[in-house]
Design a protein with these regions (language model features):
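A structural boundary signal for the start of the first folded domain, especially the loop/turn
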Residues: 1-137
Length: 137
């Protein structure tokens, strides 16, 4: 699917609201990238975008990127070192499976929002916002 066509089907305000709600509860950062390029290696492309966005610069190493490449019909979810240490591969695989189910039904916005919400829950549990009285783990 062409990225512009894909982007037109997204409810951007809903995705932004989900990111804002998730980030209110954590010191972590969540980003969503819709790539205009075709990629056969979504994980490598996501890792490059993760670095380009500076998500690796957080002192707590608690950033998450949901990277979607509509031209290739692929996506990847990248969590920084500290996030991955808290959840391991199983969390990412399960999240990717659920998001894939949404995407197969062309429910792109709900799929991305689900990913944002689950990443936010993980971040809030392990990297809570001090504004909410939480302490970093």
């Amino acid at each position: 699917m062409h990225p512009r066509t894909f982007s037109k089907h997204l409810r951007h305000a809903g995705i932004v609201a989900a990111i804002q709600a998730a980030e209110q509860k954590t010191t972590g950062q969540i980003r969503v990238c819709i790539s205009p390029r075709h990629t056969d290696t979504p994980v490598a492309a996501a890792q490059a975008e993760f670095l380009r966005l500076g998500l690796d610069k957080s002192p707590a190493r608690n950033g998450v990127l949901i990277f979607v490449a509509p031209r290739a019909h692929k996506f990847a979810i990248i969590g920084d070192e500290a996030v991955h240490a808290k959840c391991g591969d199983a969390f990412w695989r399960e999240l990717a499976d659920v998001m894939s189910g949404y995407f197969r039904k062309s429910e792109f916005t709900p799929g991305i929002i689900h990913g944002v919400q689950k990443a936010g829950e993980l971040l809030a549990e392990h990297f809570p916002s001090p504004r909410l009285g939480g302490m970093k783990s």
